[in-house]
Amino acid sequence: MGFQASERVVALNAQLEAFMQEHIYPREHEWEAFTLDQNNRWQVPDWFDVLREKAKAEGLWNLFLPEEYGDWGPGLKNVEIARIFETMSKVNWAQPIFNCNAPDRGNMEVLAKYGTAEQQEQWLKPLLAGDIRSAYAMTEPQVA
């Protein structure tokens, strides 16, 4: 199967790569040093939220929601999103900068597709804004 990226996706991917070059790649050593310090467990560096705000301001936010989810995302096709994620995933901690990380991403997809208006208001909108985090839990029948 061949895939020819649209001009929009090529431009978006170039914008994402430029952001990665300017803000993400230069911080890889800082990130590693920060995470190796056990005192920082479950923390993020001070600059992390600054980068999230920059990504949001540059329109590099919630890029994962495909066209069938309507106004919640940029309206890309799944095959287009794959190209974006290929770039984003070059650094293992980059996806949260763009609000495209698990488990939030999957939970937002479920809420966008199946959530009631009330659930979307209470949970989806704050997740899309990056104001809250989510979790995913699963058990087996007759276990819990």
Q: Language-model features: where?
A:
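N-terminal membrane/targeting module of cytochrome P450s
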Residues: 1, 22, 43-44
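N-terminal glycine-rich anion-binding loops that anchor highly charged ligand groups
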Residues: 18-26
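Residue-level signal for inorganic ion chemistry
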Residues: 9, 20, 116
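Intrinsic disorder at enzyme termini
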Residues: 1-16
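Glycine-rich flavin
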Residues: 29-144
